[in-house]
Amino acid sequence: MDHRLLEIIACPVCNGKLWYNQEKQEIICKLDNLAFPLRDGIPVLLETEARVLTADESKS
């Protein structure tokens, strides 16, 4: 995942900043508590593909 991409893309739900979780290979929106998957290194920024973060994940 190219970190320069994170400077360009935004959450498709709230237009907020996104964070990369290397361990889970996900792009995270902390404002909406959503995790977007990476497929073959490409972020899938579709709300229908996102999962809701657990309470523990939201805290970190």
UniProtKB/Swiss-Prot annotation:
UniProt feature coiled coil, ranges: none
An annotated GO cellular component: cytosol
InterPro entries found in the cross-reference section: Trm112-like (IPR005651)
Stretch forming the signal peptide: none
Assigned protein family: Belongs to the UPF0434 family.
The name this protein goes by in its record: UPF0434 protein YcaR
Lineage: Bacteria, Pseudomonadati, Pseudomonadota, Gammaproteobacteria, Enterobacterales
Name of the coding gene: ycaR
